[in-house]
């Protein structure tokens, strides 16, 4: 579960290393985001010659969480850390590669590009 002020790693090659959630999108009093949800983030740490700079604000989709996601069969998919993929204004990934596994819950119409870039889908 991701909430405001949560720090997440970045699972793409956009140039950001760490981002902080500043808003959970979807509803005025929505408090938590889980895998597949879109959040508003600010870049807290970036590499020198990346596509994004420290302090910039982007949309991001949560691809991995420590709390995990429960499947209909009762199994729980859990990860070691929280991670997100940065999106541009058209909700397309900024980076051209996605690092680490992602879950099958991302297989919606608007997020298929992230699933196709990922090396492993759990």
Swiss-Prot record:
Protein name: Large ribosomal subunit protein uL14
SUPFAM superfamilies: Ribosomal protein L14 (SSF50193)
Matches recorded under InterPro entries: Ribosomal_uL14, Ribosomal_uL14_bac-type, Ribosomal_uL14_CS, Ribosomal_uL14_sf
PROSITE patterns the UniProt entry points to: RIBOSOMAL_L14 (PS00049)
Family, as annotated: Belongs to the universal ribosomal protein uL14 family.
Gene Ontology biological process terms, A to Z: translation
Superkingdom, natural source: Bacteria
Taxonomic path: Bacteria, Pseudomonadati, Pseudomonadota, Gammaproteobacteria, Lysobacterales
GO cellular component: cytosolic large ribosomal subunit
Subunit-structure text: Part of the 50S ribosomal subunit. Forms a cluster with proteins L3 and L19. In the 70S ribosome, L14 and L19 interact and together make contacts with the 16S rRNA in bridges B5 and B8.
Protein function: Binds to 23S rRNA. Forms part of two intersubunit bridges in the 70S ribosome.
Keywords linked to the UniProt accession: Ribonucleoprotein, Ribosomal protein, RNA-binding, rRNA-binding
Gene Ontology molecular function: any one: structural constituent of ribosome
Any single Pfam family the record assigns to this protein: Ribosomal_L14
């Amino acid at each position: 579960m991701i909430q405001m002020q949560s720090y997440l790693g970045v699972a793409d090659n956009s140039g950001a290393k760490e981002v902080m959630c500043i808003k959970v999108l979807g509803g005025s009093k929505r408090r938590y985001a889980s895998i597949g949800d879109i959040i508003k983030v600010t870049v807290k740490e970036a590499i020198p010659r990346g596509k994004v700079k420290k302090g910039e604000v982007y949309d991001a989709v949560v691809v991995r969480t420590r709390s995990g996601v429960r499947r209909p069969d009762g199994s729980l998919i859990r990860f070691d850390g929280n991670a997100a993929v940065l999106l541009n204004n058209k909700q397309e990934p900024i980076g051209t590669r996605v690092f680490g596994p992602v879950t099958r819950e991302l297989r919606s119409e608007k997020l298929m590009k992230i699933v196709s870039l990922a090396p492993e889908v759990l």
